[in-house]
Amino acid sequence: GGSCGQCRVHIKEGGGDILPTELDHISKGEAREGCRLACQVNVKNDMEIELEESIFGVKKWDCEVISNDNKATFIKELKLQIPDGESVPFRAGGYIQIEAPAHHVKYADFDIPEEYRGDWNHFGFFDLESKVDEETIRAYSMANYPEEEGIIMLNVRIATPPPRNLSLPCGKMSSYIWSLKEGDKVTISGPFGEFFAKDTDAEMVFVGGGAGMAPMRSHIFDQLKRLNSKRKISFWYGARSKREMFYVEDFDGLAEQNENFVWHTALSDPQPEDNWEGYTGFIHNVLFENYLKDHEAPEDCEY
């Protein structure tokens, strides 16, 4: 417990002193105001707590898997159908929690397209298994935006052990999600979140890599498709090689349709067959060296 920092509450009375495990997520100023991580608070006496109003809008849905396709070697796009007549009233940048029952998953049963199987064979990942004897709950950001109604779309990276030590346990939730097939039933709850865009005209700079694509896509689609925003928006995305890039046509289309939007990709390990002439290296360095370093007022941007 205490690792994700998502269960913040404000304790107005009781609860004892803040624990060292909470200080990575809570500043001294926030602690003075009573901010705590709920999972770290021992309830020994009566307490008075204050919760965000949005918590009371949280619901559960039993969804059905529409598709679960690879978008990159180690990233799947899980698309879930919300029950008819229902909707998840989330904001761009929000997340849901997904439940995994006890399970025994064999990686050899995963549906992996041929173009991605080389790395899986090379690292011996098809020999892995995930055995979990209790329910697991994890949080994932939505990749869809609010007007893509009736669905929940997630980008899920498989959490394998390091190739040099495959005896370590696999990721409980990612293993379960990667095993899902069309028609399977999945329980989610939500919506949750605090990573929301501010209602200003400030320039927006989005930076992410890998499965961090999900909230970026949600935010950018929401700004340009739903809000028709005229804010200056740039997206800086990092991938290992050209094969690991996804949603390329979507973002190319947005750039063509919106003169206020540009996007850039940097590859950290481009392959010879990529014939890559774009940026190389890690995306945060590329962003700084090629844009923010010479920006007139980077502190005024919304990141």
Swiss-Prot record:
Catalytic activity line of the entry: a ubiquinone + n Na(+)(in) + NADH + H(+) = a ubiquinol + n Na(+)(out) + NAD(+)
Q: EC number(s) on record?
A: 7.2.1.1
Compartments in which it is found: Cell inner membrane
Question: Keywords, A to Z?
Answer: 2Fe-2S, Cell inner membrane, Cell membrane, FAD, Flavoprotein, Ion transport, Iron, Iron-sulfur, Membrane, Metal-binding, NAD, Sodium, Sodium transport, Translocase, Transport, Ubiquinone
Q: Name one Pfam family in it.
A: NAD_binding_1
- The ranges of region (Catalytic) come to 201-303
For the keyword Flavoprotein, the answer is: yes
The GO terms describing molecular function are:
2 iron, 2 sulfur cluster binding; metal ion binding; oxidoreductase activity, acting on NAD(P)H, quinone or similar compound as acceptor
Amino-acid positions noted as binding [2Fe-2S] cluster in the UniProt annotation, renumbered to this chain? 4, 7, 39
One of the protein's GO biological processes: sodium ion transport
Q: Which residues form the FAD-binding FR-type domain?
A: 58-198
Q: Which cofactor does it need?
A: [2Fe-2S] cluster; FAD
- The chain positions of domain 2Fe-2S ferredoxin-type read 1-55
Q: Which GO terms describe its cellular component?
A: plasma membrane
SUPFAM superfamilies, A to Z: 2Fe-2S ferredoxin-like, Ferredoxin reductase-like, C-terminal NADP-linked domain, Riboflavin synthase domain-like
Q: Which family does it belong to?
A: Belongs to the NqrF family.
Q: Quaternary structure?
A: Composed of six subunits; NqrA, NqrB, NqrC, NqrD, NqrE and NqrF.
Name the chain's protein: Na(+)-translocating NADH-quinone reductase subunit F
